[in-house]
Amino acid sequence: MKNIKYEIGDIVFVSKYEYDNGNEGQNHLFVIISDDDQLVPIEYFGMIISSHIEKEKYSTNVRINKNANNNLHKDSIVKCDYIYNIPVKNIQFKIGRVDIDDYLKFIEIYNEFLDDLSKKITA
């Protein structure tokens, strides 16, 4: 098992993950938004990054521009409507970090999404 501890805001390459519908996904970038609060985490939680910038039009997608800090190859979006469980064994490496302001924006959008969803359920 890897002894690398990733931090909130790290952008990591994940070899295998599970979509919310149960289907398996492979080889994608994620922003780490939390861990399991263990001294040596066995899983992390993250939001998926997509290079399909045309999807920026959706309210839960947030654009991040490539820069020397995040090391993205192109401008991308973070999909802020779902948090993925990422086992540490599936994280291959870190490529960069997002700015704290971007991270806070992701969390704000996610919380707004949950509030809207809650209102629809109780309506």
Indicate residue ranges for each PLM-predicted region.
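C-terminal terminal-subdomain/extension
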Residues: 67-123
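A residue-level detector for short acidic-glycine micro-motifs
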Residues: 13, 32-34, 82
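Compact nucleic-acid interaction/catalytic patches
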Residues: 21-27, 32-67
